[in-house]
Curated annotation (Swiss-Prot):
UniProt source species: Burkholderia multivorans (strain ATCC 17616 / 249)
NCBIfam families: apt, PRK02304.1-3, PRK02304.1-5
InterPro entries xref list: Ade_phspho_trans, Adenine_PRTase, PRibTrfase_dom, PRTase-like
Locations listed in the record: Cytoplasm
Protein name: Adenine phosphoribosyltransferase
Pathway: Purine metabolism; AMP biosynthesis via salvage pathway; AMP from adenine: step 1/1
Keywords: Cytoplasm, Glycosyltransferase, Purine salvage, Transferase
Length: 188
């Protein structure tokens, strides 16, 4: 376990939380954007973050880690690599070159559609879905729906940050999807 400068053991969750920058009024007034770039710039923080996810899923017998476009693409492939499983991209509409399945959803500030290659996984494959944060839960729910339409077993939804006041993690859990997040922030 890492230690703080005082020699006390470092709480990995508190450390991860401290490495996330809040940008007020971005991308629109009233939104408190949780910026993970500061977390990713720190080799120590990135290692701790990846280790938290790997420790959680090392015995989950996964076949894939699916990442949600776009910030889910940052952490999901690293976790997939560390777990020696494949990575499945779930992209914004029009970005995948092969035959796709699509799903539309509502998000914190608008609506969108995501797609997955129709051969991204096969029936019975065990998958987790990853993103940087859970706000309204729409993106992750759409990803889950796509994976399940392909026959995959979605083991859990995972994110660095939960914004519980926006209700997404509760929505996902109420829909039967277990959710794991490293930290949470109140408000938007």
């Amino acid at each position: 376990m890492s230690h703080s400068s005082s020699g006390a053991p470092l709480d990995p969750v508190a450390f991860i939380h401290s490495q996330i920058r809040t940008v007020p009024d971005w991308p629109q007034p009233g939104v408190m954007f949780r910026d993970i770039t500061t977390l990713l710039q720190s080799p120590k923080a990135l290692r701790i973050l990846v280790d938290l996810f790997v420790e959680r899923y090392v015995d989950a017998k996964l076949d894939y880690v699916a990442g949600l476009d776009a910030r889910g693409f940052i952490i999901a492939p690293i976790v997939a690599y560390e777990l020696s499983v494949g990575f499945v991209p779930i992209r914004k509409v029009g970005k995948l070159p092969y035959k796709t399945r699509s799903e539309s959803y509502e998000l914190e500030y608008g609506s969108a559609t995501v797609e997955i290659h129709e051969d991204a996984c096969k029936p019975g494959d065990r998958v987790i879905i990853m993103d940087d944060l859970i706000a309204t839960g729409g993106t992750m729910m759409a990803g889950r729906n796509l994976l399940e339409r392909l026959g995959a077993v979605v083991v859990e939804g995972a994110a660095i940050i939960d914004l519980p006041d926006l209700g997404g993690s509760a929505l996902l859990r109420n829909a039967g999807l277990p959710v794991y997040t490293v930290t949470e922030f109140a408000g938007h």
